[in-house]
């Protein structure tokens, strides 16, 4: 399993309120800094990734004051938000959340129910990159190409190997048949 890139590292970060630290303390990559919100539900923190990017999850490292209920939302403009994850069973500690990959510039944790006496508090708010393959082949792929003549006899068989990710190439079977002479 490939480690996903932390897209939020040192990116501009904003919050509805702050009672401890700064919002940027949740995205600075340090283990000894944190952000905490006012003691209220409906508090939030969001990060600006700088451009629209594929996002496939978040990692929330809660301090003792965690979110029992919260949503993860994404946006292209920081005004209109789309929910990609919601829970009312948060237990604190580290929540590593994955969701179907979505393109977004802004990612927000929106608290809806406090899990402790104080406001939401995060050691880190990591936005995890998606798993979309980059241009060309990724680290490992295996493709087997077989060419057959009209009678079904194999005339060429080639194997190509490269990469670490498994991909489904069955769509190659839907390509039009090539005419060989």
Task: Indicate where each model-derived feature is located.
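Carbohydrate-binding surfaces of carbohydrate-active enzymes
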Residues: 1-6, 129-180
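Short beta-strand-plus-loop segments that form exposed binding edges in beta-rich domains
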Residues: 110-117
């Amino acid at each position: 399993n490939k480690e996903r890139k932390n897209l939020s590292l040192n990116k501009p970060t904003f919050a509805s309120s702050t009672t401890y630290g700064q919002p940027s303390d949740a995205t600075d990559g340090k283990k000894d800094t944190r952000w905490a919100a006012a003691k209220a539900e409906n508090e939030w923190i969001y990060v600006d990734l700088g451009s629209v990017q594929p996002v496939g999850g978040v990692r929330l490292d809660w301090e003792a004051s965690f979110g029992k209920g919260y949503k993860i939302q994404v946006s292209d403009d920081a005004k209109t938000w789309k929910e990609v994850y919601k829970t009312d069973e948060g237990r604190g500690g580290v929540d590593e959340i994955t969701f179907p990959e979505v393109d977004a510039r802004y990612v927000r944790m929106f608290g809806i129910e406090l899990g402790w006496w104080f406001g939401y508090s995060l050691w880190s708010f990591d936005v995890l990159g998606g798993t979309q393959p980059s241009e060309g082949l990724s680290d490992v792929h295996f493709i087997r190409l077989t060419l057959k003549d009209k009678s079904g006899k194999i005339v060429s068989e080639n194997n190509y190997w490269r990469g670490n990710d498994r991909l489904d190439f069955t769509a190659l079977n839907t390509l039009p048949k090539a005419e060989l002479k």
